[in-house]
Amino acid sequence: MLDIQIAVSKINKYATRESGDTVEVVERPLGGFTLMLVDGQGSGRASKLISQLVASKVLALIKDGARDGVVARAAHDYLYLHRAGKVSATLALCTVDLNTRTLVLTRNSHCPIAVYGPAPLGLRWLDAEAQPLGLYRTTRPVVEEVDLAPGTCVVTFSDGILEAGRRAGRDWDV
């Protein structure tokens, strides 16, 4: 029996009431589910509006059965069209595909995804260069597929973790 656990933690940024991060979990029509993390450019209300704009497009496409690479490209085109290449958002999709028994990990973000699995996989950082959504006309996602195996863990995060402590000169070595 397959046991899948999801945990989400969200902490407000200092002196800001709203975060630009949006997290959703959606069931896929052909089996499986997708966890989505979108981070809108900047902070505060404007950032939240950007992330919700992208998230609503991503959710609609996933519910229609589109695959993750197509979803990421369409979300990029949508943001690029509506904001004329002037705002960006990062996107991470972690999909459990029950038909192929794989994890499909899709990124348009400078934040890596950590995958830990049983030997021989071990710990891997999926950190190939990826452009954010919305800025450049030909942006493409980075997509990796990993076999589903007992004990596999995936950790994705937004730039709040990656850049924590940087202003105070105490960066984390993520």
Predicted regions and their residues:
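Intrinsically disordered, low-complexity terminal regulatory regions
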Residues: 1-20, 27-31, 58, 66, ...
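Acidic loop->beta-strand submotif enriched in PP2C/PPM serine/threonine phosphatases
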Residues: 16-33, 89-91, 125-168
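Catalytic core of PPM/PP2C metal-dependent serine/threonine phosphatase domains
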Residues: 48-120, 141
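Beta-strand-turn-beta hairpins that frame and shape the catalytic cleft
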Residues: 3-5, 29-33, 98-102, 149-150
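Glycine-rich phosphate/pyrophosphate-binding loop regions near the starts of catalytic domains
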Residues: 36
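PP2C/PPM family metal-dependent serine/threonine protein phosphatase catalytic domain
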Residues: 2-20, 76-81, 111-145
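Active-site-proximal, acidic helix/loop segment immediately C-terminal to a metal-coordinating Asp/Glu
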Residues: 43-64, 148, 152-174
